[in-house]
Amino acid sequence: MSSELLEELHWDDGFAIPVANEENKMLEDQLSKLQEERASLQDQLRDYEDRINAMTSHFKNVKQEFSFTQSLCKAREHEIESEEHFKIIAERELGRIKDEIQRLENEMTSIREKKSDKENNIFKTTQKLDGLKCQINWDQQALEAWLEESAHKDSDALTLQKYAQQDDNKIRALTLQLERLTLECNQRRKVLDNELTETLSAQLELDKAAQDFRKIHNERQELIKQWENTIEQMRKRDRDIDNGALALARIKQELREKENLVKEKIKFLESEIGNNTEYEKRISVADRKLLKCRTEYQHHETNRNQLKDELDSLKATVNRSSSDLEALRKNISKIKKDIQEETARLQKIKNHNQSVKKKLKQITEKTMSVEEKATNLEDMLREEEKSVKEVEVQLNIVKDVLFKKVQELQTEAMKEKAVVSEIEGTRSSLKHLNHQLHKLDFETLKQQEIMYSQDFYIQQVERRMSRLKGEINSEEKQALETKIVELKKILEEKKSTFDLLESQIKKLHNDLYFIKKSNSKNCDEKQFLMTKVNELNLFNDRSEKELNKTKALKQDLMIEDNLLKLEVKRTREMLHSKAEEVLSLEKRKQQLHTAMEERMEEIKVHKTMLASQIRYIDQERQNLSAEFHERLSKIDKLKNRYEILTVVMLPPEGEEEKTQAYYVIKAAQEKEELQREGDSLDAKINKAEKEIYALENTLQVLRSCNNNYKQSFQKITPSSDEYELKIQLEEQKRAIDEKYRYKQRQIRELQEDIQSMENTLEVIEHLTNNVKEKLSEKQAYSSQLNRETEEQRPKLERVTKQCAKLTKEIRLLKDTKDETLEEQDIKLREVKHFHKIIDEMLAEVTEENAEIHIILQTYFQQNGLELPTAGTKGSRQSSRSPSQTSLLSARSTTSVASQTSIKVLELNFPASSSVTGNISRPASATTIPSNGKNKKGSK
């Protein structure tokens, strides 16, 4: 057939059969390469998307597990706290009940004793009454006789009457006392009954509360068990994920081993790879450029990370400096306020001092007695002492407040330093982990690129092998021509069988019509079921929304319950703190009382010492005055003696007489000496008197201090103004403390939220940057591929047009409108190539995933087919001979394809597997579908 066609075209025998020229072959090779690169890039993109999804899901699972463990820990802590709290309450309640029982027992014993005493008294009084009644019920006749006998004794009768009245009064008093005691006994019994009923009701309430607590405790235990089960399940899932990762690593290792085997086999094909040296050189140049770009990228990335770290450190320093500046501003404003207050106080003190000075001047100017001056001075001193005390009290208060604030500031500074150090540590660890993650991503990218390059190289080698095996020599051409002659004879024989097959095809068409009818019915049923499924999905969505609403309501109720518990706990803590404060105040009161008593004893001792000193000074003063008088008397005596001596010691005659001036000077000198001694003694006396006066003043000051000290320990009455001021200040303090705690709690919560949000933001920014970079690279690469495909598209259209033109010319030459044998042979080869690609894809997928291998094997066995493997792929390539590519095989396969229908295999994978969809495969490798062009397009 082909020889006749070539003869009609006047084709010379020396030329080969027309095939595609070198340019078209190169274009086809480039197109196939681009398509393969596009497919590999799409697979790589899907792989990246799967990895991102896996990482996000793993991150969500980790987050959820962390939140679950945190909530479980909090629940455990709350449970322990509540159990301890209830234990303390139960112990207190037990102690209180024991005290109450002891008190009631004591009251019962006292009541029993009182009851026995009262019964004894009643018994005695009844005996007395009986005796009195017996005495009264004497014989009236004897009494009248006794009265007649004692009528003359009026005084005795009067006394008897008086005693009788006294006895009546005593009887009435005893009866009244008896009635009163019975009433009191009844009242006590009523009170006892009331107390018993109250205790019983309280006991019942306590039992009910205990039952409720046990119920709540059991519910909490069940909830915690459920949480623990969920956490255990999540851990199991994590273990399964880890096992899957290990299996994936193992499979990758096996893949690497197989790749090594392939490399060893490829060494045998080095003789056929001479044509690839130029491409390899280009690839090496491109690799060098890529390595340079990667090194530059790593350098830029390290610079960027360093700059980012510096920016973070600068931000931290700026934040720290701003916080320090704000703290300094606040301290400066506080110091300014304190300075203003102190200046105002100083101005007040100065004004007060000026007024005191004015008063002092007025007092000094006025002619007052010494006593009035002393009283004024004492009043002034008292006022000054009061003002000084007030200032000292205020100063002590300010000092205490300042000390507390300084301590709080120190603690807050320490906390801030600790938090800053923790933040810096976490940041450094995060940077280190990010750096490691970048390194690992870079290494994985390198390995994937190496794998993709090796796969591409293997595919090229396989294509070349197939081309080498599919080429036809001149000797084979002659053999084929002889076979064509033989096959023509066979064709005539087959035409008879063709008629039979046409009748069978008609029958099959009828069967197909009935099958289509049943298929349309099945489609209607499928649509009905799909509507039902959609309705069920809507119902599920609605129910899930309602479930979420109920969960939100439940969470709100739990939050309210926790808030109420916190409020109760806070009030209890406040109560305990107040009780502790009361105890500390009572201890302080006792300490102050003991200190006051010790101070009083010291003051008494000091008083006795001062009195003894005063007595001693008085004695010294008296001694000095006695010495002074003695010396005056001595002076008089000396004067007399002087006069006597002057008379006696007159100079004898003949000697010079000492003048009077000499003796006057001598006497004046002696007088001056005596005057000096007297002045010194007067100074000592004055000094002693001043010291006594000062000691008296100090004694008065001590007395006033002691009086004020006593008054400070007096209890404040509720009617006084100070009591109301104290209550107001306590309320203000309580409100301020509550506000302070609330603000602190808010600040802590906000800081925690900000920290968590910053961490999540950093992680998300890092992930988004990585994804954006990868996406930009892929987009650039895909745009490049699209440009290349757009450039190749007109060439492809031109080639398809040329092929269509040639097919039309060939059909016109053969005078046929149907497909020729050559076209069928070309389609057969295309289909075989398509089947080969599908087999390779299935083999690769089954090698990568064992689960998919099992599922595919079951589906293929159900449809009576064999699953393609790596071995069958190699055998299929090796078993392909030139004889199978001959026109004889083409004719036989076309005839069989026209008689048989295509067998479709539907694969429905479960949701857990990563592969979903339908895979259609022909019954055998030799079947040719009727729509070959569509197959080619789908490829």
UniProtKB/Swiss-Prot annotation:
Q: Which UniProt keywords apply?
A: Cell projection, Ciliopathy, Cilium, Coiled coil, Cytoplasm, Cytoskeleton, Phosphoprotein, Primary ciliary dyskinesia
Return the InterPro entries for the record: CCDC39 (IPR033290)
Q: Where is the composition biased (Basic and acidic residues)?
A: 787-796
- Specify whether Transit peptide is a keyword of the entry: no
Q: Which residues form a coiled coil?
A: 16-124, 164-425, 457-512, 540-825
Places the protein is found: Cytoplasm, Cytoskeleton, Cilium axoneme
Where is composition skewed (Low complexity) in this entry?
A: 875-889
Where along the chain is composition biased (Polar residues)?
Answer: 912-932
Region of interest: Disordered: 776-796, 867-892, 912-939
Phosphoserine modification sites?
Answer: S898
One GO cellular-component annotation of the UniProt record comes to: axoneme
Its GO biological process annotations read:
cilium-dependent cell motility; epithelial cilium movement involved in determination of left/right asymmetry; inner dynein arm assembly
Q: What does this protein do?
A: Required for assembly of dynein regulatory complex (DRC) and inner dynein arm (IDA) complexes, which are responsible for ciliary beat regulation, thereby playing a central role in motility in cilia and flagella. Probably acts together with CCDC40 to form a molecular ruler that determines the 96 nanometer (nm) repeat length and arrangements of components in cilia and flagella. Not required for outer dynein arm complexes assembly.
Assigned protein family: Belongs to the CCDC39 family.
- What disease does the record describe for this protein? Defects in CCDC39 are a cause of a primary ciliary dyskinesia (PCD). PCD is characterized by recurrent respiratory infections and situs inversus. A spermogram showed oligoasthenospermia: the midpiece is narrowed in around one-third of sperm cells and the flagellum is shortened in around one-fifth.
* Record-given protein name: Coiled-coil domain-containing protein 39
Question: What organism is recorded for this protein?
Answer: Canis lupus familiaris (Dog)
